[in-house]
């Protein structure tokens, strides 16, 4: 297998491939790929003993820069349980899966800097994940039937070249390269008497999720389905009930993605350093979730863009 030679302008900035450009603002992507990940790589190499350094300090750095959350963990739990139950045959019953899910949740350490918000969110997710899991299974069954997939297969790793781009494009479809699962969770709220705001199922797929599956479609032109599941039910979208999942629509979305990736490559090429690259984009610190990170890391980002001293 031959690996493509990466251009120096990409290596210098640790921006080695493209992925869905609509998953978060470009400012957050640059900060993560070009600033945070190199620091995490060094910290992990110290912790693993591959590089000399202070292991305690490295562990502290990993904790600070690793931006996990209760909802993200809950989504991974459901995905893992489905893989174990439907694909790898590691669990005999749904009850076994639920017990395994509780063990995974027990390993998660909530954020310590958000006044208990993530800890409260974790309780909500733990109390509802069994229902979300069961509904996700039903939604997956329906999607598998609609897509006429005989044998369910797990996550794939797509890495492919794109005409007009110097860097490859990466995507990881959940099932068979054709079915994407999205779980939605009730949200903790201290202003609601119950302490939680229910999550509804969407009437149409989100733009970000459409862009995500358009990347999978671009690789093999296989039909795509998106399954949404919450604690109350599920909803399956295919081209039968969502025109934006039709081939022509996915092609148009893919063209949009490639255009945005091309703009990023132009920025990466024109900037001599990571600092210059950062200065080429306007940060959106008011984004609803992109900058929900450790206060010290947020301050670091604002300093890079010159918003604070």
Model region roles, listed by residue range:
Residues 84, 185-187, 230-232:
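Short loop/turn segments at secondary-structure transitions that flank enzyme active sites
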Residues 54-61, 183, 231-235:
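Short acidic (Asp/Glu) and glycine-rich catalytic loops that position anionic groups and cofactors
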Residues 1-172:
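Metal-dependent nuclease catalytic cores that hydrolyze phosphodiester bonds in DNA/RNA
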Residues 143-148, 177-180, 218-225:
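Secondary-structure boundary elements
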Residues 77, 211-218:
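Short amphipathic alpha-helical face segments that pack within enzyme cores
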Residues 158-212:
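Non-catalytic protein-protein interaction segments used by genome-maintenance enzymes to assemble
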Residues 154, 218-309:
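Metal-dependent nuclease catalytic regions and adjoining charged, substrate-binding loops involved
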């Amino acid at each position: 297998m031959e690996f493509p030679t990466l251009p120096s302008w990409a290596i210098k900035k640790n921006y080695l491939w493209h992925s869905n450009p609509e998953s978060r603002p470009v400012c957050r992507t640059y900060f993560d790929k070009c600033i945070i990940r190199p620091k995490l790589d060094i910290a992990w190499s110290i912790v693993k003993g591959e590089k000399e350094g202070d292991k305690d300090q490295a562990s502290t750095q990993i904790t600070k820069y690793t931006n996990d959350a209760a909802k993200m963990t809950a989504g991974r739990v459901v995905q893992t349980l489905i893989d174990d139950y439907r694909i790898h045959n590691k669990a005999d019953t749904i009850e076994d899966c639920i017990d395994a899910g509780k063990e995974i949740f027990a390993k998660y350490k909530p954020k310590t800097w958000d006044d208990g918000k993530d800890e409260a969110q974790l309780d909500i997710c733990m109390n509802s994940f069994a229902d979300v899991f069961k509904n996700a299974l039903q939604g997956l069954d329906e999607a598998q039937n609609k897509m006429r997939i005989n044998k369910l297969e797990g996550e794939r790793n797509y890495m492919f070249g794109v005409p007009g781009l110097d860097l490859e494009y990466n995507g990881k479809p959940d099932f068979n390269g054709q079915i994407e699962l999205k779980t939605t969770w009730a949200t903790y709220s201290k202003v609601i008497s119950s302490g939680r705001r229910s999550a509804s199922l969407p009437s149409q797929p989100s733009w970000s999720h459409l862009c995500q599956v358009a990347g999978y479609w671009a690789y093999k032109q296989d039909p795509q389905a998106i399954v949404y599941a919450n604690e109350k039910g599920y909803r399956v979208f295919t081209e039968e009930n969502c025109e934006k999942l039709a081939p022509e629509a996915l092609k148009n979305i893919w063209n949009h993605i490639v255009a945005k990736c091309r703009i990023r490559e132009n920025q990466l090429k024109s900037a001599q350093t990571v600092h210059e690259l950062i200065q080429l984009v306007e940060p959106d610190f008011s984004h609803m979730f992109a900058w929900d990170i450790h206060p010290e890391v947020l301050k670091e980002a604002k300093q890079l863009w010159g918003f604070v001293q």
